[in-house]
Amino acid sequence: MADVEQNVAVPDAAGNGSDAVNGTAGRFVSSPEGTALAYGSLLFMALLPIFFGALRSVGCSKSKNASDMPETITSRDAARFPIIASCTLFGLYLFFKIFSQEYINLLLSMYFFVLGILALSHTMSPFMCRVFPANLPNKQYQLLFTQGSGESKEEIVNYEFDTKDLICLGISSVVGVWYVLKKHWIANNLFGLAFALNGVELLHLNNVSTGCILLGGLFVYDVFWVFGTNVMVTVAKSFEAPIKLVFPQDLLEKGLDASNFAMLGLGDIVIPGIFIALLLRFDVSLKKNTRTYFYTSFLAYIFGLGLTIFVMHTFKHAQIRRVFTRGGAIKRGSDRI
């Protein structure tokens, strides 16, 4: 669902409607400083999950813990992904046409409430390990569900966690309640960053050609559903979920109560991010001190996203960013391998 709500006019994270491509209300004209702050903040936030998610993906690929094992995307998976995404998008479109938008978004809010708590807890876990006081006991727990008895007993759930994980879960739950009750843009971004980082960390491409297939297929998917139909725009306007990063362009004027947002869909972060993470793992596999492929593709993404923001601001159409953010990463990565 990362690409469903990308770069289109959507209701902002605080619940106020926005009716321009960059999330600006019709009569509001942002100041140059506010616009620069919003776009610069989105660019910075986009880089965080890619950089740290890629670093964590290296450790994830070496982990022997079953719960930390990454999901490997094959060429077949990449080819099918645009088809599955299209079916999901059209299914949501039909749901919003048939059923009440209020009830659908209520179900989606609860769904992303649970997912967001788990994603944010997983994101916070390494940091909690570093700041957790050494003099406090770190007790171990195990959540075990089995089916049957005796020799026919079968494990359904076997999850081990400790005190640090419970603290992370508690903090994440507070953010989750904040998001569900207020739909505040900061809570939205905390969940969005957690989703993006987990995606880059846990979704692994098996080779460069798979990444090219995935990026190319999703480019065609975006072009068709945005320019060919009104399906994506309709779903995006109706869909309320933390699947985008937002930043207010009127922050300097209204502070934290700002309501006119620029936005960046998580698909523009996660999809290029898993490709960049693949190149970092390739660098590591070469057993050299340099990270040439990773830094080259990372800089290409920065250049592509920066150019996209310029084009979007100039021509008032954000969808063109697919050409730069994904095409730039493919070209820099494939040229060097």
PLM-predicted stretches and their roles:
Residues 2-337:
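A membrane-topology feature that recognizes alpha-helical transmembrane segments
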